[in-house]
């Protein structure tokens, strides 16, 4: 397998009597020196207080975590974002193509 060609997607769900849990995640390994992971978590409960959570973590090859300017601007809005599995796959594909083009 060539570096930069790994794309994996995981979808799991479990149901209890009054709640459902859905985990969507997708990761890929771009060229050496870059690692980008996108993971979404969405939990549905009977209560109206639950809200979707979207988290993006980018880790350079030296292992340090950091937040991009986009992340910081998103934090200013302080509104969670939901990605459907189709939208998540589209985002991952676009980022992979961008990283391979550089």
From Swiss-Prot:
Family per record: Belongs to the geminiviridae protein AC4/C4 family.
Signal peptide (UniProt feature, chain positions): none
Biased composition (Low complexity): 1-27
A biological-process GO annotation: symbiont-mediated suppression of host innate immune response
Protein function: Pathogenicity determinant. May act as a suppressor of RNA-mediated gene silencing, also known as post-transcriptional gene silencing (PTGS), a mechanism of plant viral defense that limits the accumulation of viral RNAs.
Keywords: Host-virus interaction, Inhibition of host innate immune response by virus, Suppressor of RNA silencing, Viral immunoevasion
Entry keyword Lyase: no
Segments of this protein annotated with the region Disordered: 1-35, 47-86
Name used for this protein in its record: Protein C4
Pfam families from the UniProt entry: Gemini_C4
Domain of life: Viruses
Organism taxonomic ancestry: Viruses, Monodnaviria, Shotokuvirae, Cressdnaviricota, Repensiviricetes
């Amino acid at each position: 397998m060539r570096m930069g060609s790994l794309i994996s997607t995981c979808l799991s769900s479990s149901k209890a009597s009054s709640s459902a849990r859905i985990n969507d995640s997708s990761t890929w390994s771009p060229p050496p020196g870059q690692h980008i992971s996108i993971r979404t978590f969405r939990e549905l409960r009977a209560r109206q207080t639950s809200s979707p959570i979207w988290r993006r973590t980018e880790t350079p090859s030296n292992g340090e975590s950091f937040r991009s300017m986009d992340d910081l601007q998103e934090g200013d809005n302080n509104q969670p974002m939901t990605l459907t599995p189709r939208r998540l796959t589209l985002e991952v594909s676009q980022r992979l193509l961008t990283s391979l083009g550089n």
